[in-house]
Amino acid sequence: MSDTIARPAETARTLPRILPPMAMLAELTHRCPLACPYCSNPIALTQAKEELSTEEWTGVFAQAADLGVLHLHLSGGEPAARRDLVELTQAASSLGLYTNLITSGVGLTEARMNSLADAGLDHIQLSIQGVSPESADRIGGYKGGYERKMAVAGWAADAAIPLTLNAVCHRQNMGEIDEMIELAIRLKARRIEVATVQFHGWAERNKEVLMPTREQVECATRTVAEAREKYQGILVIDYVPADYYSKYPKACMGGWGRVGLNVTPSGRVLPCHAAETIPSLSFENVRENSLSSIWYESNAFNAYRGEDWMPELCRSCERKKVDFGGCRCQAMALAGDASATDPVCIRSPLRDRLTLEVEQLSAPSVVPMNYRGRA
């Protein structure tokens, strides 16, 4: 695709007032025992020898706390692949950061879960790929993964750590959403996030087998609405719908450089998980610059803040403060221009072409899933 929207003339930019970030995603490692075909991590994974050390990560956490970060998400890859996970959790907790562990469950034991609880872990977010050993292990590419997840959920409950289930949904498992919600109830989770796959990183290679159909998306939306009513006050159900079938794009990350930031395993600081797919941007590293200077002053974080960068189609739109122009990485992937109107938007001149491509991708296919390799 190529964008046909005229760009605003190059003028001095006016940046909005920049507030401190509320949340930070710490990608502790890219190592992971699973081989999920929907993995959104980059094609080229960071190797273990390139990862930030224990001391470097604890220093980053201290900077984050000083910067004003409240929520720290410990992620990966699989964060349990880090031998120092308990130590890192304790360091973050001692700084007053709310800690959320985002995990596949593989690599955790009951003893380690208890150690994490003692270290001050506030919350655990457990991924599920399906509602049975057959579907979950097939999608995750890891035999025995489902049973391990069920054990981890039980250990979390025993340790009094609040639980969220994270269900990434796509064509292969979208018919299980109602059962996923029921599973969350049985596991006494407080929340479930039903999130449609985002086609970044490795997932881009599996579009033909993962793209849901329009009928699946409509059914999923109804299922979530009915479950929200049924379990109101019992289970929080967050829903990230398939934006390819929506009229308007999502407010990705709450707007570029507005709410949170990501730190990669090697220390690069990003406005969002997939930001490195934008080739025109260069991202600074916490090994060389402070988190504060990167957040407030770096060219990458300021690139899409405010409205001056927007094409006229977005700058003149009443939704510009609702979706902030949509996803910059999606614009890069679909339009070849990170400054373009997100092609998902019904007002984009590329929307009709995108709709046709999605219909073709969601058609029945015999293409096998391309499983993620391991770092």
Swiss-Prot record:
Role noted for this protein: Catalyzes the cross-linking of a glutamate residue and a tyrosine residue in the PqqA protein as part of the biosynthesis of pyrroloquinoline quinone (PQQ).
Pfam families: Fer4_12, Radical_SAM, SPASM
UniProt keyword list: 4Fe-4S, Iron, Iron-sulfur, Metal-binding, Oxidoreductase, Plasmid, PQQ biosynthesis, S-adenosyl-L-methionine
HAMAP family: PqqE (MF_00660)
Residue span(s) of domain Radical SAM core: 18-235
EC annotation from Swiss-Prot or TrEMBL: 1.21.98.4
Reaction(s) the record says it catalyses: [PQQ precursor protein] + S-adenosyl-L-methionine = E-Y cross-linked-[PQQ precursor protein] + 5'-deoxyadenosine + L-methionine + H(+)
Any one of the GO BP annotations: pyrroloquinoline quinone biosynthetic process
Subunit structure: Interacts with PqqD. The interaction is necessary for activity of PqqE.
Database matches in PANTHER family: PQQA PEPTIDE CYCLASE (PTHR11228:SF7), RADICAL SAM DOMAIN PROTEIN (PTHR11228)
SUPFAM superfamilies for the chain: Radical SAM enzymes (SSF102114)
Protein name: PqqA peptide cyclase
Family of this protein: Belongs to the radical SAM superfamily. PqqE family.
SMART domains documented for this protein: Elp3 (SM00729)
Residues annotated to bind [4Fe-4S] cluster: C32, C36, C39
Record text on cofactor binding: Binds 1 [4Fe-4S] cluster. The cluster is coordinated with 3 cysteines and an exchangeable S-adenosyl-L-methionine.
Cofactor(s) in the UniProt record: [4Fe-4S] cluster
Organism: Rhizobium meliloti (strain 1021)
Biological or metabolic pathway of the protein: Cofactor biosynthesis; pyrroloquinoline quinone biosynthesis
Domain of life the protein comes from: Bacteria
One Gene Ontology MF term: 4 iron, 4 sulfur cluster binding
